[in-house]
Curated annotation (Swiss-Prot):
Organism: Arabidopsis thaliana
Subcellular location: Cytoplasm, Cytosol
InterPro entries in the cross-refs: AB_hydrolase_fold (IPR029058), Chlorophyllase (IPR048264), Chlorophyllase-like (IPR017395)
Residue numbers annotated as active site: S138, D167, H244
Tissues in which the protein is found: Expressed in leaves, flowers and flower buds, but not in roots.
Protein name, UniProt field: Chlorophyllase-2
């Protein structure tokens, strides 16, 4: 792969980024004859975008179970500051175990990006949808894999260039998957036509916070199983001593925000895990979307001096 200049992926990049909220009442930023009739997004979207003029790859981030997209704003701004447009839909407010509606909504939003997103961004910013990454955290990670696999009746015409699972979870335990089950328990069974995949795991995700609460990323349905079913190229990193929700914002408001500190086994603070996840995502995207693999190789070789956590496990399938 070729090289290009870049900053340390685990710190903020060179681009100033802003947050935008788009919903059915949002007005277009770019007033053109076509924009006047541009459709509103199917779901409320939180967008982190560079403000400098340019074309930028697009990354969709699907939130975890009963979480708000706003809880990921610090992570989104970190990744966006390296030259990416982040899109985080609010897929639901209340949901049962079935994820089919989320799969359907994600495919619909992906289709909307091609016709609607450009009209709602700052005039000087252009989304490059030929470089599109689909990512998700927890239940959102499962949803991202489900959409990419295209075997549940809903898919998008937008090509997925890379796929990222951030501590993905497919249920409460082996044999207790939430419908529709994504994991097949067959090694290398995810046929994604050589789409590059990044799977990030939390070292404490398999550990219950106390006897009253089950683990947030239980064995048998977590990042390990997702990676086992991947075909190459696929990368798997596990952060030691950090938990399933440690990549969220420091200040997550409301009852759901406060409960995010109480339900899972957590690390000492969120910033290191959030920076780790953001840096891995940036390094992976730079490698597979931009052709600059220097930081990803340094992380793989254990010689990146700025990794903010201890890497407990690392695997790669090429």
């Amino acid at each position: 792969m070729s090289s290009s200049s870049s900053r340390n992926a685990f710190e903020d990049g060179k681009y100033k980024s802003n947050l935008l909220t788009l919903d059915s009442s949002s007005r277009c930023c770019k007033i053109t004859p076509s924009s006047r009739a541009s459709p509103s997004p199917p779901k409320q979207l939180l967008v982190a975008t560079p403000v400098e003029e340019g074309d930028y790859p697009v990354v969709m981030l699907l939130h975890g179970y009963l979480l708000y997209n706003s809880f990921y704003s610090q992570l989104m701004l970190h990744v966006s500051s390296h030259g990416f447009i982040l899109i985080a839909p609010q897929l639901y407010s209340i949901a049962g175990p079935d994820t089919m509606d989320e799969i359907k909504s994600t495919a619909e939003i992906m289709d909307w990006l091609s016709v609607g997103l450009n009209h709602f961004l700052p005039a000087q910013v252009t989304p490059n949808l030929s470089k599109f990454a689909l990512s998700g955290h927890s239940r959102g990670g499962k949803t991202a894999f489900a959409v990419a696999l295209k075997k549940f009746g809903y898919s998008s015409n937008l090509k997925i260039s890379t796929l990222i699972g951030i501590d993905p979870v497919d249920g409460t335990g082996k044999g207790k998957q939430t419908p529709p089950p994504v994991l097949a328990y067959l090694p290398n069974s995810f046929d994604l036509d050589k789409t590059p995949i990044l799977v990030i795991g939390s070292g404490l995700g398999e550990t219950a916070r106390n006897p009253l609460f089950p683990p947030c990323a239980p064995p048998g349905v977590n990042h390990r199983e997702f990676f086992r079913e991947c075909q190459g190229p696929a990368w798997h990193f596990v952060a030691k001593d950090y938990g399933h929700l440690d990549m969220l914002d420091d200040d997550t408001k409301g009852i759901r925000g406060k409960s995010s500190y109480c339900l899972c086994k957590n690390g000492e603070e969120r910033r290191p895990m959030r920076r780790f996840v953001g840096g891995l995502v940036v390094s992976f995207l730079k490698a597979y979307l931009e052709g600059d693999d220097r930081e990803l190789v340094k992380i793989k070789d254990g010689c990146h001096e700025d990794v903010p956590v201890e890497i407990q496990e690392f695997e790669v399938i090429m």
